[in-house]
Amino acid sequence: MKYIKTAILIAGMAAATAACTRKPVVPQFGMLTIDTLIGTPANGCKIEYRFATIANAEKSPALRSIEAANAGYFFELEEFGGTARQAADSALRQIAAELAFPQSAPQMTEPYEISAEAEAAVTDSLVTYIISRWSYTGGAHGMYATECHTYSLAGGYELSTADLFSERQLLGM
């Protein structure tokens, strides 16, 4: 009888420990695709966005935080805290205001273009976004840029190289 009580107690403690140990919610990625033209074909800006959104962001405060931070980076918005769709709408309004072409403006020789694409990957307890941009808004050539952002799935905060490597390892980089 003593052994049965002990076994039940151990099983209960194991079940309680398992119930209290929560794994972070794994993101399920979707794609927010936007193809639009601001202005006219002769005097306008073609916009192409491919944003890797977290479809299940509402399931975890960490995922909501990651989604909002990455939307801010992707759509180039400071201190943004809304949804990816809200970020896209805000970015399009901002671009339209910055590139307001008067009706009487002469036809451009090359139409303006802005293109951004994000890829996301989960590795262990981290999610990494790679944002690639290309734009032409006048001048001799377009501009390219690539950004990488890594977040903790458990806490939703962005990591830096100092969070991932020791001081000695950082000195060797």
Regions found by a protein language model. Give the residues of each.
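Sec-dependent bacterial lipoprotein signal peptides
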Residues: 1-18
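Compositionally biased intrinsically disordered regions enriched in Thr/Gly
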Residues: 20-173
